[in-house]
Amino acid sequence: MAHHNGPRKKTRYKFKKDLRKRGIPPVTSVIQSFEIGQRVHVVVEPSVQKGMPHRRFHGKTGTVIGQRGRAWLLEVRDGDSVKQVIARPQHLKAQKV
């Protein structure tokens, strides 16, 4: 059988976009910046493959702890443990205060 354990497996409904929101995201989502200590939501943008976090973190909220090139380093709780996630800004949304 063919290899079937890719990074996007089991994402048929999780990464689906609305019909009107299909296509590439606006430039404002690419150039957004965050401050260290700021809370952000991990919302995977399925049309952008670069800098995409693991599907496990889709819908989670984390804290920005640094920057790695164009991507941001986040601290996200996964059960009892705290994990570091690297994601580009297209896959992040700032939490409203």
From Swiss-Prot:
GO terms for biological process: translation. GO terms for molecular function: structural constituent of ribosome. Keywords: Ribonucleoprotein, Ribosomal protein. GO terms for cellular component: ribonucleoprotein complex; ribosome. The keyword GTP-binding does not apply. Belongs to the eukaryotic ribosomal protein eL21 family. NCBIfam families: PRK04306.1. This is Large ribosomal subunit protein eL21.
